[in-house]
UniProtKB/Swiss-Prot annotation:
This is ATP synthase subunit b. Its main location: membrane. Keywords: ATP synthesis, Cell membrane, CF(0), Hydrogen ion transport, Ion transport, Membrane, Transmembrane, Transmembrane helix, Transport. It holds the Pfam family ATP-synt_B. SUPFAM superfamilies: F1F0 ATP synthase subunit B, membrane domain.
Length: 159
């Protein structure tokens, strides 16, 4: 294959003519398409950067809100726990007070029953004393018999 100088010059001239024709008819259109595409890419990159910044801001905001919600949740739980403990303490206190009232009432009732029993015993003792006196008056007794009756009376009364 032989390449001659006129062929090289003809090829260069053809290339230059082709370049001029392409430049004249299509270069502006191609440049416009490339520029349009370039501006679209730049806009998309800028939009992506803006969206990324916005997403980071929203993420930080959401994390802050989540943290606040957790803190509020802890506060609410602690508040209700405190209220529950107070209610528990009130219930226990009321139960102790009720138990103390019942114990006091039971003691008073026992004391009243004891007094009633003592009064009944005294009444019986008086009746026995009257009975002994009447028996004593019915018969004349000597000193030994009198002592035996008193001991008998005391043993019956339980004094």
């Amino acid at each position: 294959m032989n390449i001659s100088i006129p062929q090289i010059i003809a090829a260069i001239l053809n290339f230059i003519i082709l370049l001029l024709i392409v430049k004249h008819f299509w270069f502006d259109k191609i440049t416009a398409v490339v520029d349009s595409r370039q501006s679209e890419i730049i806009n998309k990159i800028e939009d992506t950067d803006k969206n990324q910044k916005l997403a980071l801001e929203l993420k930080e905001k959401n994390e802050l809100e989540l943290s606040n919600a957790k803190n509020q949740g802890k506060t609410i739980v602690e508040e209700y726990k405190s209220k529950a403990e107070n209610v528990y303490e009130d219930i226990v206190k009321e139960a102790h007070e009720e138990a103390d009232r019942i114990i006091k009432k039971s003691r008073l009732e026992a004391e009243r029953q004891k007094k009633n029993a003592e009064e009944e015993i005294r009444a019986e003792a008086v009746e026995l004393a009257v009975l002994v006196s009447s028996k004593t008056l019915e018969k004349t007794i000597d000193d030994l018999e009198h002592r035996r009756l008193i001991k008998d009376f005391i043993s019956k009364v339980g004094i």
